[in-house]
Amino acid sequence: MKLWLVRHGETQANVDGLYSGHAPTPLTERGIQQARSLGDYLQAAPFDQVLCSELARTQHTADLLLAGRLVPRQIIPSLNEMFFGDWEMRHHRDLQKEDPRNYAAWCKDWQHAAPTNGESFQAFAQRIADFAASLGQYQQRANLLIVGHQGALSLLIALLLQMPAAAMWHFPLAHGCWSLIEQRDDFTTLRVLNSQAQWRAE
């Protein structure tokens, strides 16, 4: 099975440098063009199914990428980005002033601290691990397109490669790029990371 991983297009929150987990934030014009370009890059990819998070920015990206292709879609809540609670749509400079104790704790030990009234990294990692474990149900799908978020997809890559959760930072996913993981005979291989090349069948 091949897992085609795509981060949603650029959003206004990305441009403004804000924490955007579950908060709605629309694609920018650049983000819209990124998604359309991905449709060109992956026009020949034989997707059997597309999985998106509940958040509109992933679904909008999938709409633009697929451009009318009739690919079955499933909304997967566990693919949602980490929930930042009171920090949603806030800049780190503001948090340093307005929530200094909790923000300092988060910066010092992000794997065990949590955003104020938000989701801990441990809970987030478990949610993504549960999704990874559920991929077996899609074995009849040879090519699965997953449109998600920076944190969720980077963490998914690390977990599928049987690496510690903290290794997610080795796999930053850029806007407007596609990545590819292949699972075969109980082995998982990262074939492509952050490509803007036109995919062609081998």
Task: Locate the predicted segments by residue.
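Phosphate-coordination/substrate-recognition cap region in phosphate-metabolizing enzymes
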Residues: 37-101
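General small-molecule cofactor/ligand-binding pocket signal
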Residues: 4, 74-76, 191
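Acidic, low-complexity terminal tails and accessory targeting/binding regions
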Residues: 41, 82-94, 137-143, 158-202
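Short, basic/glycine-rich phosphate-binding loops at helix/coil junctions
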Residues: 15-18, 101-115
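Active-site metal-binding loops of divalent metal-dependent hydrolases
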Residues: 9, 150
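Alpha-helix capping/helix-boundary segments
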Residues: 57, 152-153
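Loop-to-helix element that buttresses phosphate recognition and phosphoryl-transfer chemistry
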Residues: 4, 10-64, 115-129
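Generic beta-sheet signal
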Residues: 3, 142-148
